C-alpha cells in the first residue's frame, strides 16, 4: 500500500509512545475486550488482521478473500478472526473510530461495507472524508449527533493509536494488511488459496 500520511496524524500518534512504555508490559498477542472478534474462541487457529481502512489491498482482502475464509474456516470453528486497526492516515483513523461506535452484532457488515465503498469516502482532504463517511453512516441509521459524538470520542482514538504502537513494537508492521497467524507474522494481502495452504498446514500438524 502506498503510505500517504499527514504530519499532524503522526505527531498525535507519537504522543502515546511514552504512555505505552510506562504501561504494563502486555503482549500484542493477548486478546482483550477491546478487540473485535468473530469465530469460536476455542478455535485452534487465531488470525489477527492489522488493516487500514483507507488501504486498497485491505479492501481487496475484505471484499474478495474474507467471505471465503469466513465460510470455510471461521464459520466451521477452525479459525478465530481478530480485526485490529492500523490506520496510516486521517481517513483510516476516522473510519476506525466510527466502527468502534457500531454494535458488535452488526459491526462486521458495516466494516465490510466501508471497505466496499472505500473509493467514495477516502480522500486526502479530511473535510471531504468526514462528509462522505457521514453520508454512509447516516444511510445505516446513525444520526448526526451520534456521528459527532463518535468523532469526538478521544477514548476510542487513544485505543486505536495505542494499538498501532503496540503492534509496531511487537511485530514491526510496515504495511497493511498484515496478519499474525498463531503468533507468526504474514505480511501482505493473500488470496484464499494462500490462506488455505497456511491454515491447512497448521491444522495437519
Named regions from a protein language model:
Residues 2-8, 14-89, 161-169, 200-205:
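Extracytoplasmic thiol/disulfide redox context detector
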Residues 87-176, 180-193, 197-204:
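Cysteine-centric redox/oxidoreductase cores and disulfide-bonded domains
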